[in-house]
Amino acid sequence: INPQGSIGWHGAGMQPVFFKNLVSKLGLEIQVFRVGTYKSAVEPFIATEMSPANREQMTECLESVWNRIQADVSDSRHIPTDTLNAYADRYMDFCQAEEYVQCGLADTLMYKDEVISYLKQLSGRDEDDKLNSLFIEDMINVKKNVPKDKSGNVIAVYYAYGEILDAPGSSTEDCIDVQKMCKGLRKLRDNDDVKAVVLRVNSPGGSAYGSDQIWREVVRLKEKKPVIVSMGDYAASGGYYISCAADRIFADPTTLILSAYSA
C-alpha cells in the first residue's frame, strides 16, 4: 500500500433514495401495476422508506456479499473473520497506512517507483532494465491483433452487457440492443465453424418483450450447438430470462440473480 494510501475496510451497505415527496410536490402521480411482494424497483417513486420485504431481501443480499468478501480475505490474509469484522466495526477507512500493515491487511508500504523496483527483482531484471507492463484498458486492443481462427472449431463468446432495450436510440451507456443481439445470435447459429457459444451476461434486465425475443434466439441457438452462460456482477430480471435457456449457467458466488421489476 502507498505510504499515504488507505484501504476502505468498513463493511457493506446501501442507501436507497426515495422520490415520493418530490413527485407529490410536483403534482405528479405515479401509476404502477405491481406483481409480487419482492418487486421493489418502483418503491423509490411510491414510498418514503423501504418496505419490510425489500429490506429483508437487500439485507440478505448484503450479508451474502459481505460474508463472501470476509471469507476470501480471511483465506488470503490468514486473518480470522471475527477479527476482520472487528476491523470493519472500527470503520478502517481513514487510518494511517502503517496500521493496515500492523493489522495484516497489507504487507508493506511502497511508493510506485519502489513497487517497480520490487517487480524487477522478482522477474530477475536489472534495475536499469525496462519493465514491460500493461494496463487493463490496454487489453481491449489485444483481440484486434489475434489472427482469425481457421480451424473450423471455434468457441464464440458473446457479451450481453447493460440494460435490455428495444430501441437504444442515442444512449452512450452500455446496453443490449435487442435487434442487434438477436441478429448476432442468428449469425452464430448459422456459422458452422462455431461449435459452441459462451454467453457472458451482465445485465439488470430491461424490456420484457425484448428479453423474450432474445430468449427465443438462445433457444434456437441451443438446438444446433451448446450454449453456456457465464454471469458477471448481476443477471437480474430479463438478464436471467435470457440466460435460463442455456445448457449450463455459471455464476460467481456474489452474482446477483434476482427479479426486481414491476410492469
Describe the predicted segments one by one.
Residues N2-D89, F94, A106, K120-V229, ...:
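Small-residue-centered hinge/linker elements
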Residues M110-E114, L119:
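A non-catalytic alpha/beta surface segment that caps or lines the substrate-entry region
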Residues Y100:
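Short, contiguous alpha-helical
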